[in-house]
């Protein structure tokens, strides 16, 4: 009896074209997604770095702006101080010129020389009278710091903050009124003296007349300038190194009293 024949065969499964494309797509998609993730991380780092850089630039610009502003203010103060010294120098030069003219005229005219001496004596006498009046007044704890005379006026600085009415009473104690500023030159001179504080002066709002008035009800060459300042009715005026300013009369500032030496011979 013969043995049966055994037949072997190999079975090959052919993938469809669609399945092959899907496999190829999956094989290529993996590296692409990995590349995209790497690029995304890089961009995030770049954006963060740019954000930090912009923030630092903003801070730098802000600091520079503050420095420039402070530098401008400092230059303005220096300019104002130089202008004041220039004005004071001009005023002193004018005074010296007038004095020199009178002195020169005294060579040819004795009356001119006598007039000059009389003016000097009268101013010195007024200075002495003011000093005597102030020294003879009893100290009431008003914090008087210093006083001085300039040109035709003597000024008394009371370094104790008070209301406008309080400063008025303190000045009256020394037989003086709150200071009246007569012109622009006197204003600039006093502004240089009050650095860096603020002081009440003899200017307040008269509710009956409904206008700003000096304490002696007199006139000043500053009246036109004061009207242009548009002060609010009902207040009082104080002086600082930069300006005249109106405020509530019950606020506290230092005081300036003043006396005019107006007893000159005719």
From Swiss-Prot:
A Gene Ontology biological process term: cell adhesion
Record: glycosylation sites: 87, 104
This protein's UniProt keywords: Cell adhesion, Disulfide bond, Glycoprotein, Lectin, Membrane, Receptor, Signal-anchor, Transmembrane, Transmembrane helix
Main location per the UniProt record: membrane
Cell compartment(s), UniProt: Membrane
InterPro entries: C-type_lectin-like (IPR001304), C-type_lectin-like/link_sf (IPR016186), CTDL_fold (IPR016187), Ly49_N (IPR013600), Mouse_KLRs (IPR052013), NKR-like_CTLD (IPR033992)
Lineage top rank: taxon: Eukaryota
Membrane topology reported for the UniProt record: Single-pass type II membrane protein
Residue intervals on the Extracellular side: 67-266
Transmembrane stretches, start-end: 45-66
Biological function: Receptor on natural killer (NK) cells for class I MHC.
Protein name: Killer cell lectin-like receptor 6
Source organism: Mus musculus (Mouse)
């Amino acid at each position: 009896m013969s043995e049966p024949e055994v037949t072997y065969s190999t079975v090959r499964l052919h993938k469809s074209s669609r399945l092959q494309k899907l496999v190829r797509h999956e094989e290529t998609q993996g590296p692409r997604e990995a590349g995209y993730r790497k690029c995304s991380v890089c961009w995030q780092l770049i954006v963060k770095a740019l954000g930090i850089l912009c923030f630092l630039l903003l801070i730098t610009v802000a600091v520079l702006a503050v420095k420039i502003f402070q530098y401008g203010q400092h230059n303005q103060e220096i300019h104002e101080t130089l202008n004041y010294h220039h004005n004071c120098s001009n005023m002193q030069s004018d005074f010296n010129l007038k004095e020199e003219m009178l002195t020169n005229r005294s060579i040819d005219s004795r009356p001119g020389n006598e007039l000059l001496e009389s003016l000097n004596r009268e101013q010195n006498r007024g200075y002495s009278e003011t000093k005597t009046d102030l020294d003879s007044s009893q100290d009431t704890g008003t914090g008087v710091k210093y006083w001085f005379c300039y040109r035709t006026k003597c000024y008394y600085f009371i370094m104790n903050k008070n209301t406008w009415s309080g400063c008025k009473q303190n000045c009256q104690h020394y037989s003086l009124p709150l200071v009246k500023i007569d012109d622009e030159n006197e204003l600039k001179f006093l502004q240089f003296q009050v650095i860096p504080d603020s002081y009440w002066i003899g200017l307040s709002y008269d509710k009956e007349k409904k206008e700003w008035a000096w304490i002696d009800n007199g006139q000043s060459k500053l009246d036109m300038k004061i009207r242009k300042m548009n002060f609010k009715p009902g207040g009082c005026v104080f002086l600082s190194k930069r300006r005249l300013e109106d405020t509530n009369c019950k606020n506290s500032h230092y005081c300036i009293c003043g006396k005019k030496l107006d007893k000159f011979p005719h």
